[in-house]
Structure formats: C-alpha cells, structure tokens
Amino acid sequence: MSIEKVSILGKESIHVGYGIQSHIVEETIKCLASSTYVIISDTNMSKTPTYEKLQDSFQKELAKQRPQSRLLTYLIPPGENHKNRETKAEVEDFLLQQGCTRDTVILAVGGGVIGDMIGFVAATFMRGVRVVQVPTTLLSMVDSSVGGKTAIDTELGKNFIGAFHQPEFVFCDVSFLQTLPKRQLINGMAEVVKTAAIWDETEFTRLEGFAKRFLAEISAPTPNLESIKDELIKTVLGSVRVKAFVVSADEKEGGLRNLLNFGHTIGHAIEAILTPEALHGECVSIGMIKEAELSRYLGILPPSAVARLSKCLAAYGLPISVDEKIFSKIIGAKKNNLKIDSLIKKMLIDKKNDGSKIRCVLLESIGKCYESKAHQIFKEDIQVVMTDEVFVHPFANRHPESVSITPPGSKSISNRALILAALGEGTTRIKNLLHSDDTKHMLDAVVLMKGATVSFEDSGDTVVVQGHGGKLFACKEEIYLGNAGTASRFLTAVAALVNSTQDEKSVTLTGNARMQERPIAALVDALTTNGSKVDYLNKQGSLPLKIEAGNGFKGGRIELAATTSSQYVSAILMCAPYAEKEVTLSLVGGKPISQLYIDMTIAMMKDFGVDVTKSETEEYTYHIPKAVYQNPQEYVVESDASSATYPLAFAALTNSSCTIPNIGSSSLQGDARFAVDVLKPMGCTVEQTSKSTTVTGPPIGTLKALPEIDMEPMTDAFLTASVVAAVSQGTTTISGIANQRVKECNRIKAMVDELAKFGVSADETEDGISIHGVQLKDLKTPGGRGVKTYDDHRVAMSFSLLAGLCKDPVLIQERSTTGKTWPGWWDVLHSKFNAKLEGHEYIRQRSGSLRNGDRSIVIIGMRAAGKTTLSRWLAEHLNFKLLDLDQYLEKKLAVDIKLLVKEKGWDYFREKETEVLNECLEKFGKGHILATGGGIVEGEKPREALKNYTKSGGIVLHLHRDLKETVNFLSKDPTRPAYSDDIEEVWKRREKWYHECSNYHFYSTHCTSEAEFANLKLVFAKFVSKITGDDTFVLPATRSTFVTLTYPDLRKVPSLIKDVSETSNAVELRVDLLANQETAYIAEQIGLLRSVATDLPILYTVRTKSQCGQYPDEDEEGMRKLLMFGLKMGVDIIDLQLISSPSTIAEVISKRGHTKIIASHHDFTGDLKWDNVEWKNKYAQGVSIDADFVKLVGMAKTFDDNLLLENFRRQNTEKPLIGINMGPQGKLSRVLNKVLTPVTHELITDKPIGVGQLSLKEINQALFQIGGLLEKEFWVVGFPVSHSRSPALHNAAYAALGLPYKFDIFETDDAEKVYTQLMQKPTFGGLAVTIPLKLDIKKYCTELSESAKLIGAVNTVTPIADGRKGFLGDNTDWIGIANSFKKADFALASGVTNGLVVGGGGTSRAAIFALHSLGCQKIYLLNRTESKLQDLVDSFPDYDLEILLEKNASSVSIGLVVSCVPGDKALDETLMKKLDGVLSNNKGDKQTRPLLLEAAYKPRVTPIMELAKEKYDWTVIPGVEMLVNQGEAQFKLHTGYTAPYKVIHSAVLNE
C-alpha cells in the first residue's frame, strides 16, 4: 500500500493513497486515543461497500486495540440543503444524548457537506473536539477537507457561520471515488483545475493532457478508476500540496489564502441561486471563466490564457457558461433567476469582502495570480463581464492621442494553418493563433477526427499541433461548429478524407440555427461529383451534413463557378494533395470572388511543403500535386487584417493615431489595404511599411465620403468603412460586396437598418451599399433596444465605434458575438481606448406574455369547423379586418375554387394556396384575421410557414368541433369541392398537423338554439381575450377559492357545474380523473365547462398517483403532452407538479404564454412535517422556476400540524402560497389559507372521504368562530326604501356563503345622518344608496371610482381599510344594465349596435355609460324635456350622443334600448310617438333580436315593455333583472365574494 503524506502547519497530517481504509483505522486508533469514536456520514454514503468496509474495520480494530472504547455512528440526509443550523443541532443533540465528552474523536466520512458541517460540530461541541476528515468525493479531497475551514449555510449564502478548526488527519482514499457518479467526479475537477491555474502551470499542462483519458474512463459503462489511479493520486496530490502550502502560510485567510478563492466570488453567487440543481464545481468553473474574463477586461490577462482555461475546463466536461445546453437543461427554469442585481447582492455579502467592497482574485497568467492577493473590484466592471449587452458611452476626449494595438491572429490564416497542420506530418508550433469560437470549433473537430494531437505552450500563446499526415477517422460525436462559417466549409472538405472505423461509418457536421440557414450546396455538389457521399439532414443546401466515411477524394479535374465563395475554393485546394489522382481545379465563368484569399491559401500551402502551380493555358486554373504536407517547426499567424480595421477606424473617427505593428503592405490579407485604399482617400494620414500600418484621423467632422469604391478584395471591411462613411461629408457608394448578404447575416441589409437608427440613411444596391453621411451634430442616439447585432461579430464591432460618437450612451446587443474573431475587443475598447462601457441586462419578458396587440391572427381547422362564423366574431371582437384566404385566392386567380380543383387538381390548388398564405402573412401581418382553407396543413411548406409564425410570437388558432357534426354538415353542403377521401380519414391524417402548426386550440360546442350561439360567442370572446393577453387571471386582493370537479364526464352534470362553481374564483378540471385523456375528449370537456361556467377561470390539473391523483407517474412524456395541450387550450391556470422532470418544467414555463402557473407538491404520507427542510426546498423550487403560485399540500396527523404550517406560511412570502393539510385534522389549514383554497360544495354528493374538504360556507363559518371574520352591518339608504328588495338580496347571499353580516334598511333623505349614524360605526360594512342621496353622499366619500365620477352619482359605498382611510363611492347601476343585456344573449348581436336611452334623470347617465361599455357606436337620447338631454350630451363629450328628433325616429337603426322613465306614471304622447317609431323601424327577427331593458322594477310590466314586446316583438328585460345584476356587483364590492345568482334572484322575486 503506497501512501503519500503532505505536511500542513508543520504536521504530516494529510495522507493520500488508493485503498487505504485499514491505514485510516489503524492511524486513527493508534494516534488519537479516546473513549468514544463517532463516524458521521450521510445515508447515501452509508450504503457503499467502501463505507461498510471502513466501519467494519474500525469496529474490529477498536475491539483489539481499545476494547474499553466505543464506536458510534450517525447518518444525516444527503445534500447541501441539509447543511444548516437544524441538522447541526440534531447531530449535537445525538452526541449529548450518547454522553459524548471532550475526548470524543469524530470521523467525518463524506463529501464537502459532511466535512464542512461535521467539522463545525467538532469545532463547537464541548468547545472543540478532535475531528478526522475522510473525504469521499474528489471535490472534498482537494478542497473542503484541507485547511480547517468549517461552516454551515444560511438563507443569505453559503458557509456564513463557521470556524477554523484543523483536523487531526485528512485521509484521501482515492478508491472512495469509485462510488461516485460521473457528474460528481467531473464536479471535483473544477477545484483541481483552479489550483493549477493559480499556482502551477506545469501541473495545468499535465491536467490538459489527462483530460481525455479521465473523461473516457469515467464515461465507460463500468468505470474502473484503478486503471487511472496513479494519475488520480497525482491529481489529488497536486491540489492538496498547493492548498497545504498556502494554508500553512496563511491559516486564517488573511491574504495569501484568498488566492484559493479564484472563481469563487462569481461562482459562489451563481451557486447560491442555482443550488441544489447546480453543483459547486460547475458554478466555480463558470466563475473562473467570468473572473478570467474580468482579468482580461482589466488588461491583466492575455486572451490566450482565457481560451486555454476555457478549453481545459470544457475538456473535463465542466460548464464554462450558464447557456451551455446540458447545463441549461440541468438548472431548468432557475436560469431565469440569474439576474445581475441578484448576483451582485450575493457577491456583496461574500466572506472575502472588505466591508461592502467586492474582492476578487485576478489571474495574470496560467499558474500565476496578479500580485498574489485578492483585489477590490468595482460593480460596474463585474456588470460588463456578466452581461451580454453593453452601453457604449460617448468617447468624448478620454481616448489617448496615440496607441499601438496588436489584433488577434487572422481568422482566415488561423483556420487554414490548423487544417494544414492537422493534415501535415510532424509537429509545428503555431504562434499568435486566434483564440476564438471559430478556432476552438476547428481545434475540437480536428481532435475528434483524430487528425492531430494538440497541446499548448507559453501560457497558451503557442499551440502545438502534431499532425497525423492526413489520417483522419470517423467519430461518434456530432461535430458542432456554432456559427463558424469558415470552419464549416473547410471541415466539410476535410471530412471527405475521413476513414471509417469498425464502429463509425460517417461524420456529422452541425451548427447553430443561423449556421443551418447558411448555404454550402456549391461545395457539397463539387465534393459529391468527386465521389463523396453527403446527405443533408435538415434543410437542403445547409448544415447539418452527414458525410460517409471511406469514400475519399477521387481527384482529377474539378470545376467550380468563379462566383462561388473563395472559402469553397480554399477548402478543395487544401484537401486536394490527398486525392487519389492529381487535382486540376478550374474556376469558370469569370473573375473569382476574393482572389486574394485564394492566393493566401496557395501561399500557405507552400509554407507547408506543397507547391500549387497556376495553369499557363487556362485562366484561373490550378494544378495541385499529390503530396503530404510537411509541418514547419514554427508558424506565426499574422494579425487579422479585418479586425485591424476597427482600431484604425477608431483613430479616423476621433482625430487620434493608431498603429498596427504587424500588418503592412506585404500582408497576404486583402483587408490590409483598408488603410491605404479607404481611410486615406477619406482624409486620414496613413503611414504603411511592409510590416506595420499607422493611421491618424483628420480633425473631427472633416472626413470625406468616397463617391465610389470597389471593396471586392476586402469585403469583410465594408462594415467598418460604412460606419466611417456615416459621419463623412457626402455619399459613399461601396460595390463588390454581394457575398456579404450570405455571411453570419445579410450584412448589407443589417447595415442599412442599423444606420437608420443613428439617423443615417443608406440604400442597398445590386452588389453593395450607398451611405449618405451626416454631420456629427446630426447623429442620433438609437432608442429602445439600441443596435441589433444579428449574432454577427463584425456588426457588433463596427457599431461600437459609431456608438461612441453619439451624445448619449448607445446599447449594443449580443456583445459576446465578437468572440468569433476578437474575444477581447471590448477589453481593448475599455483598457486601450479608455472607452466607458456599462453592462446592461435585458430582462426578457416571459415567452408569450406580451399582448398580441394588432398582430394578425391565423385561423386553421377542418372545413365546416366553424371557421367562417368564429373568424367573423373574432374580427368584430378585435376590430380587425377579416380576410378569407380562399376568397383571396379566387379573386387573385379569377376562378371559383371548386372549378379550379376540377380542372387542375388538388396539387395545383395546394401550390397556389401556399403562395397566397405566404403573401398574406407578409402583406397583411397587422390588423387582420387570416382564415385559411381546411387543407392548408397538407403541404410541408405551408406547415413550415405556420410553425415559423408561431415561433415568431404570432397566434395560429386551430378551431374544431365535434367531428360527427362536421360530417353531417358537409354531407349536406353542395357548394364545396368534394373530398377525395372519407371525411374522418381526412381528419385522422390532418389532426397531428393541425396540432403542430397551431399554438392555440378552441373547441366549439354544438349549438342548437340562438341562446346557445349567443353563449358560444361570449365564451369565444373571453377565450380570445385570454390568449391575446387582454384579460388574464388576476389574483383577487381578498380571500380566494377554487372548486374542484372530479367527474369523469362533465356532460352528465352541466347544471350542477354552474351551481357549485359560481361563488368560487376558479374551477379546477381534474384531467387525470376524466374518463379518458385523449386530447379530443379533453377539448370537448373544456368546451363544455366554458359554456356552463362562462365567467370562471379554469385551473387545469393532471395529478399523478404519487401526488394523490390517478395519472401514472412513469408516463412522463404523456404528462408533458397533456400539460402542453392545456396551454394550447388557453386555460387560465395550470398545475405543474414539482416532481416533473426538469425538461417538462422548463418547457411549460417557457411556453406558458398568458397562463398562470401553480407549482405544486403533495405529501399524503404525513411523514414531512412543516418544519422539515424539504418543504422549504419545494417552495424555493417553485419560486425559482418563476411560478405564479406555489401549492404545498401535507397530511395532518395532529392538530399542531396546522400551527406548523402557519409558521411556514409566515416565513415564505416571496410567491403567493396555497398551503393546506389534508385529513380531518387538517381542516383548520383550509380555513386559514387565503390564496386559492380548494373547496367543495353542498351540492356535490360524492366527496372524497378523509381528505378534509370544506365548502366556502363552512370555511367562512369556521373563520368567524375563531375570529378571522368579524360581524359587519350594511344598509340601503334613501327615501323611500321600506319596500327595497336589497336587504332580501344581500341577506340571502350572506346566509348562502356563511358570512356573519347583516343588511338592513335606513330610511332618510339626510346624507349627514347616514355619515354620522352609520358610516362611523366600527361594524360598518357598506351602503346601497338610492334616491335622493346618490349625489349628496358623494361629499362623504374620500375617493370616487371612474364610473361614479362620469355618471355623477354614487349608489355603493365601501370603507377603505376598514374606514381608516376613508370611503369609496362607486356606481353599480351601469353594471346592472350591462350585465342584464349580456345575460339576455346580447352577444349574438352582429357588428356594431346603436343604443337608445329613454329619460333624462340620474339612471339615464348610468345607461349611457353601460351602452358605451357594450360597444355602442352611437347612443340616441329621448325624453319629454329635451333641455335635460343637452345636459347629458355636454356631460359625455367623448361619447357619440345624439338627441333623437321626431323626424328621425322612424329611420334610425337601434338594437338596444334602456327605459329610464318612471314605470308607474303615464308617458308623454310625443315621447311615446317617437318611441313607437323606433320600435317599429327595428322590429325583432331571427337576425337582429333587438333588446329593451326596463330600469323600473315596479310594476313588473310597464307600458313601454308591453308596447315593445306585444306590438313589435322586441325582447324585453324586466327591471328586476337590473336590480339583481347591480346588487350582484354591489355584493362583490362589499364582500369580495361572488354572490350565488340563483339564490339572490329568487330572494328578489319572492316578495
């Protein structure tokens, strides 16, 4: 057994080896005499063979060596969330109960959680007992176990309470690592890499070489760490020795020890937010990169060192960005919580800080820290590094007069050098290689295909490539290239040379979304013509590509169009020496694009030993011999000439000087001519030698435009030229840059669009751009979201220059895109040019949470699904124009569709239909309802267009109804072209397409009567308001409830649904309890529920068996689909179980649209008490995924469980909590819960037994009994009021809901009496105000609602904050009028309706307000005394009011009438004559159904009602309906509850 010992604080107490359990036992018992030894571990570790062996060995050895001593064991739950005060106290209580004394020795066997917390127990128990650390994870071996730092976590951060307490021994048994999962092993490597990065470059280099073997071994199906145990021991020792040395020099972290916190300032802040999903090492890895970038930003660390650190961490499988795909999946929706303000708050309370000053370790090079101490860092600098958007402040006069800048290596040369070196034989040292995203992808690809071995020297500045002579092999992994265009083209050709292996027969190249749009077809065609087999895996002509291995490169004559990209030409040139036959490459069809880059490739091939000869007989033709590249010993990459244009342009724009010391006239790069050919003619002074270039800008404002310049030799530099031209005098026209339209973006269009934001106009030309320069003083500061960079590095860098010339800071989006060619550009701008930068965090709104506004809505669905009718309703509701795409097509082609199909067939029709769809989406993108034909989804192209529309935030609404009804309808309709297939078969074929092409779905219930159609229109309008964001669920300020429906089929209980749900704030549909979970059935059930409970929000729940439901837990995919279908149905609230997979949670959260989310967790075992940390974790999880509510349900086994829950509720207030206990003993929790309490109803007979459900009435009664509800008094006031039905209405509702309230009569005409005798009472609850007090009471109201102000009368008074802040005067008369019309099927009225108000009194004002709210375009007024009407017209200047004259009475169109004249008095003859004319002219029929509401409720039938109904067949609404409806609204204002409508209606009618 080999054991390495490391000294710390003068004692060899750290022992490292493999399989040293017996040594641990012997050494502990021999050296640490004690009466009691206590092994403390966690429940996971205790199940491992290594732990069991350790415990057994200890027991046996102790019996031999110290038989009088005893061994105790204690296990705690695993995980960081148990590293807290509570768990520490439990351990201490155990030790005390066992009679442990000060001679106790504790062995902490476990990872960092055990080591930290048990070390802290040892530090404080009996004022300090001895502790032995036995770390069992790689992370704890190299980090937490060494150095004596012990601690527990608090809510404010990690390790905030602890002590320095040195262990007697630290035993690092590497064999323990065999028990760890892969992710935990990788997690530990972060601290290993960190230690080498701050202290030992030699060890760092060893780690770079070990990464591949390490990852391969731990990724094996059955890992065997013994095969790499020597390397693992070296790895642990390397870190432990550094830490031991540092701790010995600075035990209490006074200075030097702070260096060990590299990566932790930012890493700990990230971890505090992402724990427990993200592991410590993962967060520290990301922290290291961010702190390295901070060092680079401050001008301390070279870019190559950042690149090297990134590559090393990534090689071990560690995340280097929170945006990495796998890491993002792990942390799920918690990623949304990584706000810069939150992170900085966490950093501000870091233990390393000096007061409130943030301190951070800065890296100077790999293996060395800057000044060997932590430094104070400004929040502003951290903000720049941590955000991907930046404000560039005005350059003003902060910049230096002259500066020398060395840009990174040329991207073009770097990529070519890597390809040539990988294909070559021998070892070459490449210096000044560009360390960027592009070259990183290239290096990774070369290594994956085994084309070369890559290592680093000179702190990463030198890349050592050992080429394998063109021997490349297929690999299992996809080769991901991001948006690296150069790499994709070169590697496509290289992949054609790849050999197959026994297991792998192909290579797959892929990239990001933009890369998958960029063209590569011309190169692929050339390769396939030459024998390669290449398949497009997605879009034809773009990546991803699958290239079959083993076909090789045939060679011979290859022709490429001269107009093709020079990168295609270079790709074939570089691979040509490895063809089976010598290659002749001919560029045909004119002068080649970017000839200079072709010349560059040929020159570089010569540097690597292959001479390309130009044909003497054919123009633009090259002969390439068969050969193997011979790698030169050293190759120095020239700085990137395209990148050099930015600092040179800075000098031009700011009247300063800039020198590029390593690019001159001898450069191979076309862009090296930028200074001489572009900046010099614009007025700059240019000095250029063969190796250097210096530019001095003219006085500010004197740059001259270039009337015409051909930039074909330096196309990438046109963007830089454009921003200089923007502030030059005159118009600059650039040509020869057509290829820039197919780069990272359409750069010419991007330049035109973004220049416009600066007030600079520019025009696209056939092969270029014209820019009309402006005076500097006329340059505008872009507003809103600033400059869009299109994920294009050159767009970002170019506009960073123009931004600094504006008067105010300019926002640049996606600044990290510069990583493609110049990762440190912003650092140079900041540290070399002294530009002030300010990091900006863009808080993205929830996906779909923006209101739809005027964006057009597309309708799809089967023929006869109701698209025509519902589309018309939709257009009316949104005030959009309706465009039927079939009619548009008929008009465009001047032919009937039925005839078109008959003559030219369905295929032709589908083709034209697709053209029309694309045209209409482009042309009518705003303010339209685009109704499509049923078969629009038949073609792939229209499906793609519809899906893209939803991805861009547009609404595609799928309308559907019962299929049998559709079949019945179509079989009777001869006007439509006949289906060639059975209708049901057509539906089966299309169903999946409708679902994938739409983001919303509406199911129309079958209607057989006008009332049902009216209700459907109302339901549909509410649905549309929800999905467009105009009417979303808002939690009431008062107590709220939802009623649960557990019926398998709602069709059997429609009337019951309305009665049991109307007093709740939402209704829960338990999807898991439905008869089946087919989406068609669920849609039908939701359609029915909406038609019955019209006004109630729907809570959509799929509960699994483990969460007290019926849905199978194992069907995760089925659950995901059901949840996504709920979102598609536009439900108001969705229940999302916290036990769902992170991917399901993330998808639901990201696609929630306007639906609110309840994050739920149920424990029906009762094992989890409310003081258990697991509940806190579940609540925190709900908060972290940004749910709107968190619902936690326990099981009460004792009455005290309710009190524990209330304590939990008080402590957790970040999100509204629905917290209840199930069971009979949990009823109190339902009474005390205020937010969306689940309730049952007296009418529900089959209630679940033993759950403890209560009705709303029972909750209120119990709440009153325990003092949660107090008695209140309400009155109707006025004169006369003795016959008022208000007391009957309100008291009936109080009784139904169990409210301890009383409503009475107070008859008076004196408002002061009301105020002094009623409103001042402590039990005052509110008033119903009638004549003559509706005006007088206003002076006693502190506030008036908008309706009360406009109507000018108050009929409802409620106290504000129990009267302490005064009283609110409101008016519900208008609601009574409006709701009476709505309940009388007003929704069926088509188009805009005009209204008429009869009378000129106070109620008339409420009637006008109501009719306006219903959308009446014009409101006519009719009264015996016309002077009163003029007052009304003057009071509502914004409403279109018109006094109805006798001559017009018989001709105006009117659909709604409100009679506001006394019902018990004879009417004026003139008035009756006018009214008779109106009623006669607008007689009722099936289409119009005009409505008349009588405001007077005595007598029951008034003369006006009789006239309208009997003589002219108008639908009349008696006054009692208005009384009930306004009383219902009044009740809601008084109590916060919805009154049971049947109850109050009966109470009013039963006199």
UniProtKB/Swiss-Prot annotation:
Gene3D superfamilies: 3.40.50.1970, Aldolase class I (3.20.20.70), Dehydroquinate synthase-like - alpha domain (1.20.1090.10), Enolpyruvate transferase domain (3.65.10.10), Leucine Dehydrogenase, chain A, domain 1 (3.40.50.10860), NAD(P)-binding Rossmann-like Domain (3.40.50.720), P-loop containing nucleotide triphosphate hydrolases (3.40.50.300). GO terms for molecular function: 3-dehydroquinate dehydratase activity; 3-dehydroquinate synthase activity; 3-phosphoshikimate 1-carboxyvinyltransferase activity; ATP binding; metal ion binding; shikimate 3-dehydrogenase (NADP+) activity; shikimate kinase activity. Residues 1-379 are annotated as: 3-dehydroquinate synthase. The keyword RNA-binding does not apply. Residues 1271-1551 are annotated as: Shikimate dehydrogenase. Keywords: Amino-acid biosynthesis, Aromatic amino acid biosynthesis, ATP-binding, Cytoplasm, Kinase, Lyase, Metal-binding, Multifunctional enzyme, NADP, Nucleotide-binding, Oxidoreductase, Transferase, Zinc. Residues 392-835 are annotated as: EPSP synthase. Pathway: Metabolic intermediate biosynthesis; chorismate biosynthesis; chorismate from D-erythrose 4-phosphate and phosphoenolpyruvate: step 2/7; Metabolic intermediate biosynthesis; chorismate biosynthesis; chorismate from D-erythrose 4-phosphate and phosphoenolpyruvate: step 3/7; Metabolic intermediate biosynthesis; chorismate biosynthesis; chorismate from D-erythrose 4-phosphate and phosphoenolpyruvate: step 4/7; Metabolic intermediate biosynthesis; chorismate biosynthesis; chorismate from D-erythrose 4-phosphate and phosphoenolpyruvate: step 5/7. Zn(2+) binds at E191, H264, H280. Its main location: cytoplasm. Homodimer. This is Pentafunctional AROM polypeptide 2.
